Structures are given as structure tokens and as C-alpha cells.
Amino acid sequence: MKKIEGEGASQFTTSELCEKIGLSKGDNLLLFSKGRAEKTLEKSPYIASAKLSAKLPHTMKITIKERKARGYVPYMGSYLYIDEEGRVLEVAGSCRDALPLVKGLKFDSFTEGEILPVQNTDALAVILEISQLMEKYELLDEVVEIDVSKPKDIYAYVNQVQIHLGNMTNGDMKIQYMQQIVKTIPKEDRGILDLSGLDNPKANVTFQYLT
């Protein structure tokens, strides 16, 4: 083996992946246990799937499908990084990227790499739906906080604007409106954007400025 290629990984360098599975140049391309290496890599919460393929005459390719953090859940002074399934990817003392802080989930414990075992599963279902819609409309790096303490009366926060979503009836429309309206509001402006009325086709969207 003279060359090792990596594809699909942003959380890990190719060198880090090789270190995890004990792969190095000079190894026998055909005798290296690819299946065992794939299982080892998939133990990482960030790696959804791994595939090693030998490319003759002397190249090994590591293809990774990663899980992505979609939000942070505060927990005892730390933050749980969760993906779009509610899986705990990492526990850290700070938030690295611009992703929403998720409030309102109730749980007593967790296991890294597993789905967060919340008591209020309806709230988790709501946050997963919202995060997918916010990814669709490229809002994940804009939203500061999402509060699902009351799954039928949801609030989100962008800059100094409180956004009242209400429930997730017409959720796609609400998040689309949110994306369109928020970008027109100057960051220094304070106010309340009420999208909850979109449950009713005849209702209006309102914005109340706060001083």
C-alpha cells in the first residue's frame, strides 16, 4: 500500500482515521481487514457509515458518511451536540459553531452516540422537525435559541427578535416566512415576530417593535 485516500470526513483528517484503525502505508492492501476497520470507525458518534475499498495496484480509499451537529442542548454546565435524529454526538464545554441552543428537553441521563432519552418525546419530535426545516431554509446558523418547553407553543430567537411559531401546523410555511422576514430586520432591532397565526390561512403575520 503506497497511497491512502479519504473522502467525506470533515470531523477527522485522513491521518486520524488511519490512526483509529491502525492503517499505514506499507500494509498489505489485500490482507488488511477492511470489515473490522469499518466497524471500528463506526463506533464514533460522528461516523454514520464507513467503507474501505482497495484500489489496485496500491491505494486504499476510506469513504465516510458523517453525522452533523444540528443544535446544542445545555446539560450541567456543558453542551450536548445533537444531530437531526437527536443523537448525542459530543459533550463539550462550549459551542463551536453557530447552531441553535435547544431548550425544553427533559432527560436525566444520556449516552454519547445514542438518541437522547427524553421524557417529553413530543418536544424532541418537534425540535427534529424544526432543525430539518431550518437546514432546508439555511437558518441553522442564524437562530440563537429554540424553546420547545411547550411543543404546541414554540418560540425561537434570532438576534434580538423573539419569534412565536406556535405549533408545527404549517411548519414548513412558518420557517420559510421566518427565513424571508428575519433577513429584512436589522440586527440591532428588538421585537416579536408572530408567525403562529399561519395555522389559519386568513391570519396575518405581525411584527411588534420593542424599545
What do these predicted ranges mean?
Residues 1-9:
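Aromatic-capped interface at the extracytoplasmic side
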Residues 7-8, 27-32:
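Short, surface-exposed ligand-recognition loops at beta-strand->loop->(often short) alpha-helix junctions
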Residues 16-28, 36-39, 43, 49-51, ...:
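Charged, solvent-exposed interaction patches on well-folded alpha/beta domains
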